[in-house]
Design a protein with these regions (language model features):
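Short beta-strand-to-loop capping motifs
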Residues: 16-18, 72-76, 187-188
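His/Glu-based metal-binding/catalytic segments typifying zinc-dependent metallopeptidases
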Residues: 1-50, 208-231
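M16/insulysin-pitrilysin zinc metalloprotease superfamily fold
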Residues: 39-43, 60-130, 141-146, 207-212, ...
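Short beta-strand/turn micro-motifs at beta-sheet edges
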Residues: 1-3, 55-60
Length: 231
């Protein structure tokens, strides 16, 4: 945890083990799962941003580092946003009710919408000759995937089912919200640091304070220096 005097909001990243590269059989199912979760007006948007718990909340897969991240952006209190996100993800993964007794679930409309969104994203990424050439270069030379990676992904995504999405939720998404299988990094204001630290420790995370230039220790030094100058 890094407390800074120059910010008012809090920012957090929770990281867990993800897929074993782009060739992993679960790559397409996980892409579809994340497309559903990260969609505008979808679950993370509705229960975190819509509730005023954070300006942004998303889950990102990094196949190259084999990690998956839950990212909170500009949250008044990152621990509260994390707690709410955990409840929603658990409800989606296992069918448990939310605090108000309501239930949330994936449906076929969400699944087909995610597949359509993936089609648009891939087409948009290769929308010009230059963009298509760059994508081909990255796929062939850097990712070692050969040509037509986008086309193959679309073919694989077309057969993804709701059962695949449910399995990805339990296998890849839930571990991000478990302190025994994930780590977290938080940057926040000096005033919210104690409450965020205590709340995340209650979830099982071991929180260590990190001093950075412009951090809490510098703020104390500046304050002492200013007091001496005024005197």
């Amino acid at each position: 945890m890094c407390a800074l005097p120059a910010i008012e909001s809090s920012y957090a990243v929770f990281t867990s083990h993800g897929l074993c590269g782009y060739r992993d059989p679960d790559y397409a199912p996980l892409v579809i799962t994340l497309t559903i979760l990260n969609a505008m007006e979808s679950f993370l948007w509705r229960y975190i941003r819509g509730a005023g718990l954070a300006y942004g909340a998303s889950i990102r897969n990094d196949a190259e580092s084999e990690q998956i991240h839950f990212i909170l952006y500009r949250a008044p209190n990152a621990a509260k946003a994390f707690s709410e996100g955990r409840k929603v993800i658990e409800a989606l993964a296992y069918g448990t009710p939310l605090d108000d007794g309501s239930r949330v679930a994936f449906d076929e409309t969400m699944l087909e919408s995610a597949k359509s969104s993936l089609h648009f994203s891939i087409a948009d990424a290769e929308g010009t000759v230059g963009a298509a050439a760059l994508e081909s270069f990255v796929d062939v030379r850097l990712k070692r995937m050969g040509r037509g990676r986008g086309k193959r992904l679309l073919q694989q995504a077309s057969s993804v089912t709701l059962d695949d999405v449910q399995r990805c939720m339990q296998q890849y998404i839930m571990p991000i919200f478990d302190a025994s299988t994930s780590v977290c990094a938080v940057s926040c204001s000096l005033s919210t640091a104690p409450s965020i630290r205590d709340a995340l420790q209650a979830h099982g995370y071991v929180m260590n304070d990190v001093d950075m230039p412009g951090g809490a220790s510098d703020a104390s030094s500046d304050s002492a220096s200013d007091s001496g100058w005024d005197a």
